[in-house]
Amino acid sequence: MHSMNCRSRRLPIAAVVVCLAVGCATAPYTKRSQFIVVPESYETSLGVDAYRQVLGKEKITHDPKFVDPVREVGQRIAKAADKPDYRWEFNVIDDPKTANAFALPGGKIAVYTGLFPIAHDSAGLAAVLGHEVGHALAHHAGERMSQNLAVQVLGTGLSVGLGGQSSETQSAIMQAFGLGAQVGVLLPFSRTQEAEADHIGLILMAKAGYDPHAALDLWKRFAKMEKKSPPEYLSTHPNYDTREQNISGWLPEAMGYYRADPAISVQALPEIGAPGSRAASAEPR
């Protein structure tokens, strides 16, 4: 019996080791090693389904003054991403109180109208969309799904290993494991991914013909809007000081890709008034 328990405890860990061996990927531009075991086709199908659900619930605007700049800039960024198997899609959600944007797997992007005042112009919009396309290009959703799977497998192994403990002890240890996994594994990965999306986005906007310095200006505007930030170690995003330092450090690299495009003229975005009650979530995901 003791031998069986030992084997049971080892199996989940062995499974993770196997996954690590076969699930290695490399993020574009940053060359960061990634643990991804979720197939890209599955990740994309989930993204497409989720995107349709979101668009079905939200108020989508077809007003060209909002849609045209998003799609024009978005397609330039998508072309720079050089991912032709993605069916890139850019839509605008009519919600002036939400200053946000999001990316789902497969190249499905949405921007809330509340982001327009902070983006300010097409260069600022390029910084936002570069960030979102960066998430999609680096398969961050698939990476998070793979990471969650690994945590579940390790949690299963821990619960098997606690078989001889009292129920109270098992419960306390499993709760501590859950908190430790979130603070020690899941959230730091999210910060890593957010920083990586900034890095990749900076390069993409430069390749698309937009001055990457506009990204630094964008995050300074966000910082002014959100004067209070959660402590960085409990945040899923880098704080603004860290973000600005990172971007400043990456600018020389991004400028190596930048070639001013005479076909691009930076245009002011339509004014809709300042974002309102949802400022706490006002930051591209």
Say what each PLM segment does.
Residues 6, 11-12, 24-285:
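A Zn2+-metalloprotease active-site environment signal
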